């Protein structure tokens, strides 16, 4: 967080430059201060602010022209500052809002001809069962959506009351909840519009949904309004109102906004059709898919955190889907007759899926009692709702398939998406000492494009970041961040060949393996470290000791791991020699353009400690490395090597209890020769 308000003032002042004496700069700074509190570091705030791009200055209008338009210019755009457009192309939304106007008539919508033709960046929001929320909570959700709109993220909200289609009053109840959402938004100073006639139901057996006209939706969005759509469809031909699934509405909107709703006719010219679709795609960018559901984020019965904080769909969709289906199949048989030390029942799935020995584990082979899923906290893991969780995950998977890789989704409970989420909901927590305020996951995600908590943090660190002073106060993470993500390639595949010390002292693979693109790996290392690698020296050093390689995506991130012998231990291939080999993280790399976003580092780190080397790994880092804070949070232990500039990290259990293991780790971390061209044979 920031040391003092002047930090954020300086950050904002670097991009907000106004030539007008009438612009409420202090109000703008206060607005950004409240939002950037959702960013955990100054680097994240700077990263967000750096996305503001200056626009080309437009010729100044003469005074008569300005007078004819009926309001004075605020000079936001003219000064080269784009408060929303630099990030989302929506300067008009913020510039046109009453908060930034100085006369009574300024709250009125702009004429259509003045609306910007820049790309419109949209968040598709589905809110489930709003009827379960009181007016105060719904009002705070409306406030968050209003703030997203002010930041240039136009919101299109789909109401999902979850009513059975047999409900006689489904239409009135759906419209009532849509109107409640409208009131909640407008209470916070942003206009909204209910659109209950934009969805058509095809007469085909599949009853596919489509959008009547994209302009009916885009027009209010371009003018800074928030669109609210109830799950009402109209049959083609008869125009009879019928209930439709909110998930299908979200998918129909996604297809329409991506230009995939265009229906080709036999007489269409293919080139003209492609040009038209391309133009439609440039008009709109769906950047976020947001699901607000009382069920919350995707649960996990295999992790100490009880939840999936980040889902890399490319890698994990099938695995998590199977896990949720297992939960659905278990049904009421989830609860066994077994009880923990507190006399509470535990889940059978926990017994059949014990935790792996990974960095998340907090020093015990079995699930700690304070993290067990008991009959008293069944609602916290949503045991009856596995099917709903599967539906939410499937919706994001299907929708993100239509969208570019930069788009992302988030699932959260409505209460955590309110601006009062930092207030303790449980009076018993009032005395708990917390060092960090709870973040609004929607605002945090907008600012950082990351989940509110890192996916590679151990469960104990999640407790600390949640402001919990004891294990018993640990809360399940209610939000799940979802990306289309990237494939993860492991050499060798641990499902086929377990990563273990080589026999006869030689590794079964090298970096010259034809499956490895060595030039791209070298480029990844050099880009990440910003140093030139002595490739031949590096190959000679790791060729006979390579444990494996982890590659994320198209060499966007990766890790090189080796088996190292401590000083004085002969490399004779004996069992004694193999037992002393240390699993060592030689290189942990992420391309500069992927650092701090996309979850690349988390994906690689999780693969290392959960799949490849679950028993532990060690590594070293220079003491002045800015990444050390990230390492400290994920390591089980650290040690500043005396007489050197190195800090040693490890994720292995019992390192401090076994003196020889600790000395082996220290000896390896002291003795590794660097392979950089600037000091290629010098040990620090």
Curated annotation (Swiss-Prot):
Q: What is its main location?
A: mitochondrion
Q: Which domain of life is it from?
A: Eukaryota
Any one GO cellular component localisation term in the record: mitochondrial matrix
Which residues belong to any copy of the N-acetyltransferase domain? 505-674
| Region ranges (Disordered) | 414-439
Biased composition annotated in UniProt, kind: Polar residues: 415-434
Q: Which UniProt keywords apply?
A: Acyltransferase, Amino-acid biosynthesis, Mitochondrion, Transferase, Transit peptide
Catalysed reaction equations from the record = L-glutamate + acetyl-CoA = N-acetyl-L-glutamate + CoA + H(+)
Q: Name one GO molecular function term.
A: L-glutamate N-acetyltransferase activity
* Disulphide bonds in the chain: none
Tell me the function of this protein: N-acetylglutamate synthase involved in arginine biosynthesis.
Family as reported in the entry's similarity comment: Belongs to the acetyltransferase family.
Name of the molecule in the record: Amino-acid acetyltransferase, mitochondrial
Q: Which gene encodes it?
A: ARG2
